[in-house]
Swiss-Prot record:
The keyword Mitochondrion does not apply. It comes from Mycoplasmopsis agalactiae (strain NCTC 10123 / CIP 59.7 / PG2). Keywords: Coiled coil, DNA-binding, Transcription, Transcription regulation. The gene is greA. The keyword Transcription applies. This is Transcription elongation factor GreA. Residues 49-80 form a coiled coil. HAMAP family: GreA_GreB. Belongs to the GreA/GreB family. GO terms for molecular function: DNA binding; RNA polymerase binding. The lineage of its organism: Bacteria, Bacillati, Mycoplasmatota, Mycoplasmoidales, Metamycoplasmataceae.
């Protein structure tokens, strides 16, 4: 996931901790292990046809890329705080029941940041068209338009936040 500038990255506390632990593991365990592999491969002499050296360089690239990615995520992270959320107004962390007025079906979703979204668990990204529409609603009972190629309306039926 590409990050631009200093944009906020909304994360659940669980995901923040997972990324923080991954970062620590990469910096304290993986990076030194890769450096040791490179040193060992260099000691074998001719690097031009050294598969172990090439593999270690590839792994080093992967590790360093992921370290940089995690640094950007953690530096720009904002942990989702549902305790201070405005009740009856949907925001990140809200579980929302709504009616798709085109299909006449009720759906329940939880609005999360992109790193926590999981459609299988009905967790949608705050950047998705449905979440954007829900967050523009003034509250329960409001009807809003979902901005997709074939626009449709939804009605917010309930908004709740985990305690």
């Amino acid at each position: 996931m590409a990050l631009l500038g200093n944009e906020k990255i909304y994360l659940s506390e669980e995901t923040y901790n997972k990324y923080k632990n991954e970062y620590t593991e990469l910096v304290t365990v993986e990076r030194p292990a890769v450096q040791a592999s490179l040193k060992e491969a260099r000691a074998q002499g001719d690097l031009s046809e050294n598969a172990e050296y090439d593999a270690a360089r590839d792994r080093q690239s992967e590790v360093e890329r992921r370290i940089l990615e995690l640094e950007r995520i953690l530096e720009n992270a904002e942990i989702i705080d549902t305790k201070s959320a405005v009740q009856n107004k949907a925001g990140i962390g809200a579980t929302v029941r709504y009616l798709n007025m085109k299909t006449n079906k009720e759906l329940v979703v939880t609005i999360m940041g992109p790193h926590d979204s999981n459609p299988i668990e009905n967790k949608i990204s705050n950047e998705s068209p449905v979440a954007q529409a829900i967050m523009e609603a003034n509250g329960i009972g409001d009807v809003v338009e979902v901005e997709v190629p074939q626009k449709y309306n939804i009605k917010v039926l309930d908004i709740s936040y985990a305690k």
